[in-house]
Amino acid sequence: MSGTNNVAQARKLVEQLRIEAGIERIKVSKASSDLMGYCEQHARNDPLLVGVPASENPFKDKKPCIIL
């Protein structure tokens, strides 16, 4: 039982390694510079960086709490 189980696991591992070997790779320095460029180009549209105008914020309370 364990022999056939080990063979099946080894086949799955080999298949996964073949898939990963076929993936195109780029250097980290290239990927990081591309990512930084993308972030800089899209920063003005990012609501986490520039904020959401109060008039467009659906989560802002429309009225203050009456209890307080």
From Swiss-Prot:
Residues 66-68 form a propeptide. CDD domains: GGL. The modification N-acetylserine is found at S2. Keywords: Acetylation, Cell membrane, Lipoprotein, Membrane, Methylation, Prenylation, Transducer. Signal peptide: none annotated. GO terms for cellular component: heterotrimeric G-protein complex; synapse. Brain. Found in the hippocampus, striatum, midbrain and cortex. It is found in: Cell membrane. GO terms for molecular function: G-protein beta-subunit binding. Disruption phenotype: Mice display increased startle response but normal prepulse inhibition of the startle response. No effect on survival to weaning, fertility and mortality. The keyword Cell membrane applies. A lipid is attached at C65 (S-geranylgeranyl cysteine). GO terms for biological process: behavioral fear response; G protein-coupled receptor signaling pathway; locomotory behavior; receptor guanylyl cyclase signaling pathway; regulation of adenylate cyclase activity. InterPro entries: G-protein_gamma-like_dom, GGL_sf, Gprotein-gamma. The modification Cysteine methyl ester is found at C65. Pfam families: G-gamma (PF00631). It comes from the Eukaryota. It is a lipid-anchor. Guanine nucleotide-binding proteins (G proteins) are involved as a modulator or transducer in various transmembrane signaling systems. The beta and gamma chains are required for the GTPase activity, for replacement of GDP by GTP, and for G protein-effector interaction. Plays a role in the regulation of adenylyl cyclase signaling in certain regions of the brain. Plays a role in the formation or stabilization of a G protein heterotrimer (G(olf) subunit alpha-beta-gamma-7) that is required for adenylyl cyclase activity in the striatum. PANTHER family: GUANINE NUCLEOTIDE-BINDING PROTEIN GAMMA SUBUNIT. Belongs to the G protein gamma family. G proteins are composed of 3 units, alpha, beta and gamma. This is Guanine nucleotide-binding protein G(I)/G(S)/G(O) subunit gamma-7. The lineage of its organism: Eukaryota, Metazoa, Chordata, Craniata, Vertebrata.
